[in-house]
Amino acid sequence: MFKFTGHAGIVVPLDISNIDTDIIIPKQFLKRVNKIGFGKYLFHDWRFIDANQLVKNEDFILNKKIYKNASILLTRENFGCGSSREHAVWSLVDYGFKVIIAPSFADIFYNNSFNNKLLLITLSSSEITFLFDIVKNNIGITFDVSLVEKTVTVNKEVFSFELDDFHYFCLLNDLDNIDLTMKHLSEIKSYESRISDFLLERRDFQS
C-alpha cells in the first residue's frame, strides 16, 4: 500500500481559466474504461496540431522539454468544469501529475480526483498569481507539497491549504471508495442480515 504523505516535483504553469473536461481529454478518446493509457490524450487539441498526433504544437507549454517530467500543475479558477467524465482525471494521473494547484475546481472533477488519488490544492487567487510569477521567473522550479502538514513550500515560502478530513484520511491511507467499503464489509453484511430477518418476519406477520 502506497500512502501519499507529500510530493516534490517540477511545476508546469497553465495560466488559463475555466479549462473544461473536453479540453483535458476530448470525447473521441472516451471509449475505453481501463484507466491506463489516457495520458497520451491529455490536452490533445492543445498538444497536437493534427488529429493523428504526428505534429506537436511546439508553442504549448507541456511540449517544452523542461516540463517533460512535470508532476505538479499550476492553473487558474474553475479547472475541470464541463461534463463529469472521469477520464479527465485518468488522463492527468496517467500522464504523471500528482498535484494540481488552483483557486477553484469543478465539484464533480474535485471528487473524481480524490477517488483516483490526485491531490487538488485550493489557494486564494492572489496566492495563485504570486506563484505564477515565481514559476514564470524560475522555469523548471520544484514545489514541495506536504499532505501531512497541508503546506506548499516554494523558495522557503510556505503556503497553507485546507483539506476536509475525509479526503485527507483517504489519501494518507491509500483508500478509494471500494477500499472504504471493504473495510466495513462485516458491518454491511451484519446490517443486511438484520434487515433480511426483519423483512421475513414482517412478511410472515402480514401473511
Swiss-Prot record:
<keyword id="KW-0100">Branched-chain amino acid biosynthesis</keyword>
<dbReference type="GO" id="GO:0009316">
    <property type="term" value="C:3-isopropylmalate dehydratase complex"/>
</dbReference>
<comment type="function">
    <text>Catalyzes the isomerization between 2-isopropylmalate and 3-isopropylmalate, via the formation of 2-isopropylmaleate.</text>
</comment>
<keyword id="KW-0456">Lyase</keyword>
<dbReference type="InterPro" id="IPR033940">
    <property type="entry name" value="IPMI_Swivel"/>
</dbReference>
<dbReference type="GO" id="GO:0003861">
    <property type="term" value="F:3-isopropylmalate dehydratase activity"/>
</dbReference>
<comment type="pathway">
    <text>Amino-acid biosynthesis; L-leucine biosynthesis; L-leucine from 3-methyl-2-oxobutanoate: step 2/4.</text>
</comment>
<keyword id="KW-0432">Leucine biosynthesis</keyword>
<dbReference type="InterPro" id="IPR050075">
    <property type="entry name" value="LeuD"/>
</dbReference>
<dbReference type="InterPro" id="IPR004431">
    <property type="entry name" value="3-IsopropMal_deHydase_ssu"/>
</dbReference>
<dbReference type="GO" id="GO:0009098">
    <property type="term" value="P:L-leucine biosynthetic process"/>
</dbReference>
<keyword id="KW-0614">Plasmid</keyword>
<comment type="similarity">
    <text>Belongs to the LeuD family. LeuD type 1 subfamily.</text>
</comment>
<protein>
    <recommendedName>
        <fullName>3-isopropylmalate dehydratase small subunit</fullName>
        <ecNumber>4.2.1.33</ecNumber>
    </recommendedName>
</protein>
<dbReference type="InterPro" id="IPR000573">
    <property type="entry name" value="AconitaseA/IPMdHydase_ssu_swvl"/>
</dbReference>
<dbReference type="Pfam" id="PF00694">
    <property type="entry name" value="Aconitase_C"/>
</dbReference>
<comment type="subunit">
    <text>Heterodimer of LeuC and LeuD.</text>
</comment>
<dbReference type="InterPro" id="IPR015928">
    <property type="entry name" value="Aconitase/3IPM_dehydase_swvl"/>
</dbReference>
<keyword id="KW-0028">Amino-acid biosynthesis</keyword>
